[in-house]
Design a protein with these regions (language model features):
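Amphipathic alpha-helical "coupling" segments that flank catalytic cores
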Residues: 1-696
Length: 696
């Protein structure tokens, strides 16, 4: 067995898709060859992806697939063999279609219990790698996640083909030998191209294992992850030399990795006067427009220096590159400074009226109309949270005003952030300005939550207005489609209620949102569906945080209004299940639930001690009365784990009750009294969670 290399050398590939394209191409080739039995168990696949190439290296590849014994079912005997013992036309046709040529006597007869069937057992000859690789390449190309196809003309001037970008060379080597395949009008060979600017002649790849070394000699680093690691390490090194730290967002690192074949880091700078502009504006300008890495000093303050990733090895040490990029960024930052200076000439409050001209949703009105609804919800949320109502109302009114500014018009990512700066410039109260920034939080999974009660009130109002409104017009998420990010909004509400331990009812908040939304034409009351949606998101969130399906179901079965204590309930249930009494009590609890479900009408919880006849029911009643006060006190204190430990003491009397007492006694009074005892017991046992859901 020998190692295989395949490379498609292309024009520049779309950077944001390069990693996926590289991995998918390698996996497609690997899977197809593995399915055709060209690979060994020891085969290792390595994907390569650079701006102008997709490649895959696979170890331990066979030059020819092994012969394969196979067994083919044909037709029933009664269909395939005539009365004369010869093959019928139906059998002859079937065998011809499968390429089988043998005598009827060579076929095997097998009784499958219904019919006697004819089978053929033969040997399928192995095929050369060229055939297998041809199919593998076609399969891999067909299954690539191509964001947008480009159609281009081949060298013959007639034929057109479609691919993500034009392919210029096709390399296919098994060891040192060329594997003859054809793709995109190209015949395979060993030639490829190196760096666009630092090499000029084609490169002949000597063998599959020399690919990486030869490409590096031609100033191409084909391994995507290696390039990224080099970029990240060099950025950190250059930043440290300046006693600074580079701001390296994940998406920017990925993009520059996909844009460079041979990364080289250079330093540049801009005039310090631009530092008067909020640093978020400067950083975003550098990242989005120029792909620069901004630098912060040790105190977290933005510096007027930055790092950039090039793929040119400059003869002058990068002086011209640095100066050129300084000129480019100067123009960009001048625009940002202009926007900032112009925006501050008008107060946020003066921009609120302009929200009438900003469409929120064609069925839900303008941002101005939405702002009025958010203010109503924020007032209710502030009352429930004990937040400053005046400041919450002010923040809700101004929260979207920065949508009318030049800066946010240019950089929508800065909405809320610029609102805070402009509010501070207008001398708004500190918590009002902060709430304008924080009401968008959490923007994504793991993002920080709003930090003040005013911010929380406005953030809850903003997200709940979105949810109640869009649910009200039927814009629910479906499958993977969630164009309005409603799952993220719901998760944000849940995180705020739980992680901030807010003593607030979720249904009460939803009711407040509905009161603000109900007068919008065409909006229907979908509160029940919205609560179910929240329950589903909460279940997913709990599972992601380590709760088992049973633990989550047990707690959520309580249909809790207030969610702040859910983590403690999950922890209590988990600890309870480690107790030796847990298995018996959960089984008994499930049994009690089934008994109570079968009762027609309402079951009273009023127990008449005089009707307790059996020793076991008397004992259970006394034990329950002894446990109840302590259990209720522990529950009131939120000590759920201790409460469940306390009720674990009921295991023995519960077991004895079911062993000796007939619940459905013939005497109606006795039966009702025993059901009342069980209902009261059931209520105590399930105060923290519905523990029957934990039964095995």
């Amino acid at each position: 067995m020998t190692n295989l290399l395949v490379e498609l050398q292309t024009e520049e590939l779309p950077p944001k898709a390069l990693r996926k394209l590289s991995e998918a191409f390698a996996e497609g080739v690997r899977k197809s060859l593995a399915d055709a039995h060209f690979l060994a168990d020891s085969s290792v696949t390595t994907a390569y992806g650079a701006p102008r190439r997709l490649a895959v290296h696979i170890t331990d590849v066979l030059a020819k697939s092994p012969d394969e014994t196979f067994r083919q079912k044909l037709v029933p005997v009664k269909v395939g063999i005539g009365a004369d013992g010869q093959a019928t036309p139906a059998l002859v046709k079937k065998m011809a279609a499968l390429g089988i040529n043998c005598a009827v006597t060579d076929l095997e007869r097998v009784d499958d219990g219904k019919n006697e069937q004819l089978y053929y057992e033969g040997v399928r000859q192995g095929v050369e790698l060229a055939s297998g690789l041809q199919h593998a390449l076609e399969y891999a190309v067909k299954h690539l996640p191509i964001p947008k196809v480009m159609t281009y003309q081949l060298a013959d001037g007639v034929t057109t083909v479609s691919f993500v970008r034009p392919v210029r060379h096709l390399t296919a080597l098994l060891g040192t030998e060329i594997v003859p395949v054809e793709l995109f009008g190209l015949k395979s060979g060993r030639l490829t191209r190196g760096h666009r600017f630092h090499t000029s002649e084609p490169i002949a790849i000597e063998n599959a294992d020399s690919y990486v070394e030869q490409m590096k000699a031609a100033f191409v680093m084909p391994c995507y992850d290696e390039r990224r690691a080099v970029i990240e390490a060099e950025l950190k090194r250059r930043a440290a030399a300046l006693d600074a730290e580079a701001i390296m967002p994940e998406d920017l690192l990925e993009e520059v990795t996909a844009l460079t074949e041979w990364p080289v880091i250079y330093e540049s700078q801009f005039e310090s006067e631009f530092l008067a502009v909020p640093q978020e504006c400067l950083i975003l300008t550098m990242q989005l427009n120029q792909k620069y890495f901004a630098l912060e000093d040790r105190s977290g303050k933005l510096m007027n220096r930055f790092l950039l990733v090039s793929q040119l090895i400059a003869k002058d040490g990068g002086k011209a590159i640095s100066e050129g990029n300084a000129r480019v960024v100067r123009a960009r930052l001048a625009d940002a400074k202009f926007f900032y200076d112009q925006d501050r000439m008008h107060t946020l409050e003066s921009r609120v009226e302009g929200l009438r001209h900003v469409v929120y949703h064609n069925k839900l009105g303008s941002q101005y109309e939405r702002m009025l609804r958010v203010r109503r919800i924020a007032a209710a949320a502030a009352a429930l949270l004990g937040a400053n109502k005046t400041e919450a109302d002010r923040a809700a009114m101004l929260a979207k005003a920065d949508l009318r500014t030049l800066m946010v018009g240019e950089f929508p990512e800065l909405q809320g952030i610029m609102g805070e700066y402009y509010a501070e410039n207008d001398k708004e109260p500190k918590d009002v300005a902060l709430a304008i920034r924080e009401h968008y939080q959490p923007r994504y999974a793991g993002d920080a939550l709003p930090s003040t009660s005013v911010s929380l009130a406005v953030a809850l109002a903003d997200k709940l207005e979105t949810l109640i409104g869009l649910f009200g017009i039927g814009q629910l998420p479906t499958g993977e489609k969630d164009p309005f990010a409603l799952r993220r909004h719901a998760l944000g509400v849940l995180r705020m209620l739980i992680e901030k331990e807010l003593d607030v009812s979720l249904p009460a908040l939803i009711d407040a949102a509905w009161e603000a939304e109900k007068d919008v034409a065409g909006v229907v009351d979908n509160r029940r569906e919205l609560l179910t949606f929240f329950a589903d998101r909460l279940r997913v969130m709990l599972r992601e945080r380590g709760a088992t399906a049973q633990e989550a179901d047990a707690v959520l079965a309580k249909r809790l209004d207030k969610l702040a204590d859910i983590p403690k309930r999950i922890g209590a249930v988990r600890a309870f299940m480690d107790l030796p009494e847990a298995e018996a009590l959960t089984a008994a609890n499930k049994r009690i639930g089934n008994i109570l479900k079968k009762v027609e009408g309402e079951v009273s919880e009023k127990i008449d001690p005089a009707l307790l006849q059996e020793a076991a029911e008397k004992n259970l009643f006394e034990e329950l009365r002894a446990v109840e006060p302590a259990a209720e006190a522990l529950y009131a204190e939120g000590r759920f784990e201790d409460m469940l430990v306390t009720i674990a003491a009921l295991r023995s009397p519960v077991d004895a009750f079911f062993e000796t007492v007939m619940v459905n006694a013939e005497d109606p009074a006795l039966r009702a009294n025993r059901l009342a005892l069980l209902k009261r017991l059931y209520g105590v046992m399930n105060a923290v969670a519905e523990i029957s859901r934990l039964a095995k």
